[in-house]
Amino acid sequence: MSVIFSGIQPSGTITLGNYLGAMKQFTELQNEHDCYFCIVNQHAITVPQDPVQLRKNIRSLAALYVACGIDPEKATLFVQSEVPAHAQLGWIMQSVAYVGELERMTQYKDKASGRDSVPAGLLTYPPLMAADILLYNTEIVPVGDDQKQHMELTRDLAERFNKRFREVFTIPEIRIPKVGARVMSLTEPTKKMSKSDPNPKSMISMLDEPKTIEKKIKSAVTDSEGIVKFDKENKPGISNLLTIYSSFSGKTVEEIEAMYEGKGYGDFKGDLAQVVVEAIRPIQDKYNELINSPELDEILDKGAEKANRVAFKQLRKVENAMGLSRKRR
């Protein structure tokens, strides 16, 4: 049974892209693997956060994890800040990382571009991410392809530590799903769908009302050709919608293309909206049951307890290898 770790920031709503790129596959992975699913709230504070809203976002994300099918009897669901070893190992991994390689991270360059003042946390985000993963002897990390560079750095840092001190860390493998790994914006289909996009029409939230979902899909940018065909380079808009349809329906892109041969985008978009609405309806129902229930707190308490046991043990191995731990007389 392989160990799997994955984390999502509680920085606003969860999009269709988050669900298809990560959460949907989690429900399958938990049946065959030892899974740790972490709400990485310490990563969220690398940008300014309102304390009240952040607290709400953490709880909302936890409820969505369970509503999407995460079973606390099979997987460990917890909040990053409730396991102190994450921040402790994050500092240690900063001492292993080099400033140059951190500055080369694409996400850092994108977020720091054009800013007069750049929080140090944006630069040191990857070592903390590495710590998140390495604390649990993680073997597989399911991520969207936009996180591939950070994962490669995690592997580099783990190998560097193992060579410099001793073999402590398991080198994690990257798993990127074939379909739905990168859901694009509905308004600018050459960009990733993002919860931070200022245009609300660009993304679908997992908590959007059915009518809102229908409006967003029907207004999604396509092209003037009117043929439902996958062509990422020349038809990025319709290709993105085909990816979403395929991910929710279980049908291949080719099967969907055949279904809409001779039909226009209007029919396709209308049907896609219904597919999405029906797929996320039970998730929304379960979310509403959980969000204010003591059951959710019990799940998070239990998850933090288990994560702390495992993480503390690994942190002690790291400290022993580095000579940080005190030998008692």
UniProtKB/Swiss-Prot annotation:
- Can you tell me which residues bind L-tryptophan? D132
Q: Which InterPro entries match?
A: aa-tRNA-synth_I_CS, aa-tRNA-synth_Ic, Rossmann-like_a/b/a_fold, Trp-tRNA-ligase, Trp-tRNA-ligase_bac-type, Trp-tRNA_synthetase
Locus of motif 'HIGH' region: 10-18
Main location, first listed in the record: cytoplasm
> Which biological process annotations from GO are given for this protein?
tryptophanyl-tRNA aminoacylation
The EC number of this protein is: 6.1.1.2
- Motif 'KMSKS' region covers 192-196
- Molecular function via GO: ATP binding; tryptophan-tRNA ligase activity
PROSITE patterns associated with the record: AA_TRNA_LIGASE_I
Location within or outside the cell: Cytoplasm
What keywords sit in the KW lines?
A: Aminoacyl-tRNA synthetase, ATP-binding, Cytoplasm, Ligase, Nucleotide-binding, Protein biosynthesis
A GO cellular component entry from the record: cytosol
Q: Which residues bind ATP?
A: Q9, P10, S11, G17, N18, G144, D145, D146, V183, K192, M193, S194, K195, S196
Pfam families from the UniProt entry: tRNA-synt_1b
Reaction it catalyzes? tRNA(Trp) + L-tryptophan + ATP = L-tryptophyl-tRNA(Trp) + AMP + diphosphate + H(+)
Top-level class of the enzyme under EC nomenclature: ligase
**Family of the protein in this entry:** Belongs to the class-I aminoacyl-tRNA synthetase family.
Q: What is its quaternary makeup?
A: Homodimer.
Q: Which function does this protein serve?
A: Catalyzes the attachment of tryptophan to tRNA(Trp).
Its protein name is Tryptophan--tRNA ligase
Classification lineage: Bacteria, Bacillati, Bacillota, Bacilli, Bacillales
- Gene symbol here is trpS
